[in-house]
């Protein structure tokens, strides 16, 4: 792995203060304590918002791998912004740029060139990438509601924090047996959950280009990883994805766990999404042809 310094702009702690505040907020567990209620809400919001990032920001806004209505498109975008990873236009624009230049010097987060730390979180903190690459997402910019959401992306996370505080206060007053409070739900339900969500997502930019095994030749360093697929609801089948980014499913085979795919299939049963794109037959044929041939069994020598 190259250790060559990255030629990007420096960090700006003030402009990224929310990112650091969320991480520091996790220290609040020492003061607010823990309860099964808080842990349950933490994990539930992790899964729900991870789907919003993987199933909406990534598979829909970045790659248009399925279709939906304008209303549900906005709801997906709104849910995605609660993950505190900025708006759908910003997210999709930088991801599309990544696919155009994957693991080259033009890529914004190639771990093999600029290092694992930069690929994981450094680029997110760089002042160079604060604004979206609007020229790459003209299809999204034509929706004024998405532009507004992108501009005011900080509002949904704040509303989520407020809702958690209100819920914690209510449960503390009316269900004391749950042993929770406003502060506890803010710390666990937002700060801890969001921090886990950050680094689960970031692992795809960093570790999914370093660990695992490739099935396809893609011209980059993308890998498939079962562990990363579990913690990101299916994004760990990254080599599959880089071979055919237009596919809604990233686990190409039934044994490749892809929870975001299962959720989208479920939503399609209710008509909320449709035209979910599958990998074509030629992709599966390519995978078969790349399998290492099995050596024929050796016949034992006669005594």
Go through each PLM region and give its residues.
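Non-catalytic, topology-defining segments of multipass membrane proteins
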Residues: 1-203, 247-303
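Active-site-proximal inter-transmembrane loops
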Residues: 139-144, 213-237, 243-244
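Metallocofactor- and cofactor-centric catalytic cores in central/energy metabolism, strongly enriched
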Residues: 209
């Amino acid at each position: 792995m190259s250790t060559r310094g990255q030629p990007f702009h420096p960090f700006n702690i003030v402009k990224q203060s929310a990112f650091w505040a969320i991480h520091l907020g996790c220290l609040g567990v020492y003061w607010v304590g823990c309860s099964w209620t808080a842990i349950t809400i933490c994990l539930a919001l992790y899964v729900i918002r991870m789907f919003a990032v993987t199933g909406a920001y990534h598979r829909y806004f970045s790659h248009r791998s399925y279709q939906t209505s304008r209303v549900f498109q906005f709801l997906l975008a709104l849910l995605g912004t609660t993950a505190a990873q900025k708006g759908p236009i910003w997210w999709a624009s930088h991801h599309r740029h990544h696919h155009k230049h994957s693991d080259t010097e033009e890529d914004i987060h190639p771990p093999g060139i600029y290092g694992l730390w930069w690929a994981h979180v450094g680029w997110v903190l760089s002042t160079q990438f604060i604004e979206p690459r609007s020229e790459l997402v003209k299809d999204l910019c034509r929706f004024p509601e998405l532009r507004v959401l992108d501009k005011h992306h900080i509002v949904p996370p704040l509303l989520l924090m407020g809702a958690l505080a209100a819920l914690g206060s209510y449960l503390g007053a009316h269900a004391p047996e749950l042993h929770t409070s406003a502060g506890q739900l803010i710390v666990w339900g937002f700060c801890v959950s969001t921090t886990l969500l950050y680094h689960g997502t970031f692992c795809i930019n960093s570790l999914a280009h370093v660990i695992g095994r490739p099935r396809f030749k893609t011209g980059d360093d993308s890998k498939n990883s079962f562990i990363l697929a579990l913690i990101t609801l299916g994004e760990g089948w990254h080599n599959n994805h880089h071979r055919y980014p237009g596919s809604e499913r990233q686990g190409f085979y039934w044994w490749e766990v892809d929870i975001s795919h299962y959720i989208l299939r479920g939503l399609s049963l209710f008509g909320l999404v449709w035209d979910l794109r599958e990998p074509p037959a030629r992709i599966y044929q390519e995978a078969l042809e790349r399998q290492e041939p099995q050596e024929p069994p050796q016949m034992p020598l006669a005594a």
